[in-house]
Amino acid sequence: MGKFSEGLLNDETILANLNICADHTILDAGCGNGYMAKKFSGLVGNTGKIYALDPDRGAIANLKKEVEKTNIEAFVGDITKPTRLKAASIDLVYLSTVFHIFSESQIEGFVTEIKRILKPNAQLAIVNIKKEDTPFGPPVEMRSSPEELRKKVPLIRKTLVEVSEHFYMQVFENA
């Protein structure tokens, strides 16, 4: 989904509202073309690690070519199912413009996997399209308001920030 949101979001606002440090390990789940994974890469430095996960084999194949010899590891996968990532190994999971496509059972799988891979006190950041009529995007009934999102994701709610006219980011913390 990264291709969809690239250029529509205020990346500086997103990055300013995430506590990213050198040496962090970040998962860009549903990374699409990897544009945010690349931004995260520079922030975590040589001691950090970025995992870029997407079910689109073509997008991952292209991204792998682009990020050879970097701290980004791209692989095909689905964050609503168990991944090959180690338990309690991730400082930040970033999910942008993907949550609205999850079914109820996929949300359950997503929450289970997120809780498994996040370190204690680590962050989950979800960027969603606002639940209002917009000139693009999924039908309004597929979208979640911040309140609905908080009910679906049983982590500690932290920051809620507008990241463009039509998008918001909710940051959660793993207890």
What name fits each language-model region?
Residues 21, 83-93:
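A short acidic, Gly/Pro-enriched loop at the edge of an enzyme's catalytic core
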Residues 5-24, 39:
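Conserved alpha-helix/loop element of class I SAM-dependent methyltransferases that forms part
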Residues 108-120:
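A short glycine-rich, Lys/Arg-flanked "PGG" loop and its adjoining helix->strand segment in the class I
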Residues 27, 33-81:
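Class I SAM-dependent methyltransferase SAM/SAH-binding core
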Residues 91-105:
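A short SAM/SAH-binding and catalytic strip from SAM-dependent methyltransferases
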Residues 161-175:
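Core SAM-dependent methyltransferase catalytic element
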Residues 137-157:
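Conserved Class I S-adenosyl-L-methionine
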